[in-house]
């Protein structure tokens, strides 16, 4: 991985006997050796591969943003910037009941001609190691794979387009733990681009375009499949859905209007590009539902052919069950009888 490290520093956050957060600040950056470069490269790789990221931008009165500007313009050194940030994080952590100890990692680096600032509170795990004398010894390590209190700022995007609503990304916390909320408070940032909402708007625009173009059932299915294939391809490649590029993959309406022109004229609030959402995409080609002890999943093309839904009686009828399911049903019926 091509990565150039500028600065990296660690600060320790611990809990005392009174369950209060204490901080141990480091007074100098780490040496840029193979160990630190390896750590930052792994942080970058793991963070980039994680799903469920949110997008944000700094609030107008963000103190953190002000410090970052001071650092980037040379008015403040990296150690001072990181120390002030760590102290602010300590204050924010104290407000939340789920506050956890950990190691605050702040790293400034460049990857693929883009400057980044990584900020993460990494959990420390206890383990055992074998010494050179073949003795067992306790050891601690940073659990990079399980990090979830993390944000990354695209410094290049932030400095060239401060009006962007997506230069700051963060990992959304697990349900019931408002991790992302507290980390946004720490950075004094507000939620920006909503990727899930963008995907939902795109799916609705696809359905509306099909209806407006008066496509028959088979043509609609083919159109949805083309949209799915493009979006899934972008997802697999790690690229974003580009609406104009997608329109180039799709046939235009009878009057010559392409999908991009349709979304623009109809006022769909779609960004030029955004990350694909697997759950939203799946609805283009499948019907999926679960509840009441049932889980149902079938290709949308089967609706009206082998699977029929009666809205008045809320009844789903399946003609021709899968062989393995049929075998299970017959075995159970024979056993019960």
UniProtKB/Swiss-Prot annotation:
GO terms for molecular function: double-stranded DNA binding; single-stranded RNA binding. It holds the Pfam family NA37. Keywords: Cytoplasm. One of its GO terms (cellular component) is bacterial nucleoid. Coiled coil: none annotated. Belongs to the YejK family. HAMAP family: NdpA. This is Nucleoid-associated protein PBPRA2585. It comes from Photobacterium profundum (strain SS9). The lineage of its organism: Bacteria, Pseudomonadati, Pseudomonadota, Gammaproteobacteria, Vibrionales.
């Amino acid at each position: 991985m091509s990565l150039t490290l500028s600065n990296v520093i660690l600060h320790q956050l611990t809990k005392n006997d009174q369950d209060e957060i204490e901080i141990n600040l480091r007074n100098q950056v780490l040496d840029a050796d193979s160990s630190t470069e390896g750590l930052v490269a792994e942080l970058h790789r793991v963070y980039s591969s994680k799903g469920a990221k949110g997008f944000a931008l700094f609030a107008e009165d963000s103190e953190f943003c002000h410090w970052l500007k001071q650092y980037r313009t040379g008015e403040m050194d990296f150690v001072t910037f990181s120390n002030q940030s760590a102290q602010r994080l300590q204050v924010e952590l104290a407000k939340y009941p789920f506050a956890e100890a950990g190691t605050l990692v702040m790293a400034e680096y460049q990857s693929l001609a883009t400057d980044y600032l990584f900020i993460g509170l990494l959990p420390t795990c206890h383990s055992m190691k074998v010494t050179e004398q073949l003795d067992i010894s306790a050891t601690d390590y940073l659990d990079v794979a399980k990090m979830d209190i993390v944000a990354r700022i695209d410094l290049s995007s932030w400095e060239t387009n401060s009006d962007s609503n997506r230069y700051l990304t963060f990992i959304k916390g697990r349900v019931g733990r408002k991790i992302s909320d507290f980390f946004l408070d720490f950075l004094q940032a507000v939620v920006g681009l909503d990727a899930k909402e963008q995907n939902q708007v795109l799916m609705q625009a696809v359905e509306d375009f099909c209806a407006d173009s008066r496509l028959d059932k088979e043509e609609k299915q083919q159109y949805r499949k083309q949209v799915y294939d493009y979006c899934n391809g972008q997802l697999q490649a790690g690229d974003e859905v580009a609406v104009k590029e997608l329109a180039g993959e799709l046939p235009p309406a009878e009057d010559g209007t392409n999908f991009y022109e349709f979304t623009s004229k109809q006022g769909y609030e779609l960004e030029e590009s955004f990350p694909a959402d697997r759950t939203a995409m799946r609805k283009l080609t499948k019907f999926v539902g679960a509840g009441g002890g049932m889980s149902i999943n079938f290709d949308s093309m089967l609706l009206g052919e082998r699977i029929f839904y009666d809205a008045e009686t809320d009844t789903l009828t399946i003609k021709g069950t899968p062989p393995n399911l049929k075998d299970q049903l017959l075995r159970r019926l024979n056993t019960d009888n």
